[in-house]
Amino acid sequence: MKRYERLADQLIELIKRGDLPPGARIPSVRTACRAWGVSPATVFRAYYLLENRGVIRARPRSGYFVSQGPIEVPQASPTAPPDVDPKAVNVSDLVFEVLKTIRQPETVPLGSAFLSPALLPIARIGKSCATVNRTACLASMVDGLPPGYEALRRQISLRYLMAGMTIPVDEIVITSGALEAMTLSAQLLTAPGDVIVIEKPTFYAALQAIERLRLNVVEISVDPVKGHDLDALARALQQYEVRACWFMTSFHNPTGATLSDSGKQALVDLLAKHDVPLIEDDVYSELHFGPHPMRPAKFFDRNGLVIHCGSFSKCLAPGYRIGWAAAGRFANRLERAKWMTTLSASMPAQRAIADYLEHGGYERFLHKLRRELAQQQSQMLDAISRYFPADTMATKSSGGYFTWVTLPDYVDSIQFFLAALGSGISIAPGPIFSADGGFRNHVRLNFGYPGSARLDKAVATLGALCADETRCSTRLSGPARPH
């Protein structure tokens, strides 16, 4: 018997004896680790086993409680209609467990949200950093105050122009990463208790930001092939007083979906009809595999309602945390919000990136990076097809560095995550990508780490673990459901 199974049995005995009556809160993960001398992964796995059996149930942000009776674990559909009342967001503790795994150097970081440092121009960025530090004076440090270093904003404006868009320098606000740009945008557009429309699934950091802002969400499904369900969005806009939408329309994280140009035009027109702003997360736009970049929704904006948020963290310098917002009519308010929060993004980082964009061969680097990522995606998809169960599906994206994997519907991705972690591999389980913990048989994998032999071995291990989890799930819940 495995350690987590023994721990689960011990808790069942406590429940049977009445030490933990129905409705009682069971020990927190941290308390259980101390009491039984086990790791957080062991406790999580024991608790999820008990949850699957209906012995305990989770309450968001409160912990686990002994059930009054058996509960059924929902199997969420990636295209489930969103016609439900707005709800508060409570980010699972599992998100933070996933984030911890990517910091462990011995772990294969397929659950990471970042590219491998081996793919980035670290030495060339370092040269730019050294150059600007030699020439900078203390008085120039104030040049980075909101709206940000003008030379950097000019370079960003130039890149918009190269993409066929005219974005004035005065509408660009530099932030400490794109997440801050989007969070500040949501903050200035809403008040606690307001309704915001988000994607399902969506990036877990968006959920964390929305939880901090105490907003209620309506989730709109994103199909890996078709993109966003605009019919569902239209119903939500008619039914609720929506203050903003927060969408990623190109190379969506985690599904890889891209909304077509006609879809983006329809999205912008629909929101303009209701005078609802769009916070557009476009951090992967530079990582397109085709000959031309994808047009963002901002391209079709004629009313200044789209706040277009970008970043250099995903494709150039993650540690510098430099992002921006092309904020349209909201630029002055966003600049003021930046003043009142973190004040300024790092001035040396702003200057270094501006220097690199002007002198460092950014386009040559991106051309090489795109080619490498396209090859690595092909390698990962090939490995998944060879090693995973036959009814596994994985998305092929036209950019970015994620694939969204649909496992057999009787596989629990949280159990799979814990098993993978035990084998030294980090993955991102589906439940962290939605407000209600759905997508229990989905995982996100990162193909942004080079090394075909290491990648192949890791995917082979995951495939074997998936087969084991399939058999385990079958033993726990009975025969697999027919397809």
Range-by-range predicted roles:
Residues 1-130, 335, 339-346, 367, ...:
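N-terminal basic, amphipathic alpha-helical segments
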Residues 302-371:
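Conserved core segment of the aminotransferase class I/II
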Residues 354, 366-392:
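Conserved PLP-dependent catalytic core of the aminotransferase class-I/II
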Residues 433-437:
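AMP-binding (ANL) adenylation modules
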Residues 3, 83-177, 184, 358, ...:
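N-terminal small-domain helix-loop-helix segment of the aminotransferase-like
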Residues 134-274, 279, 285-303, 373, ...:
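Conserved core of the PLP fold type I
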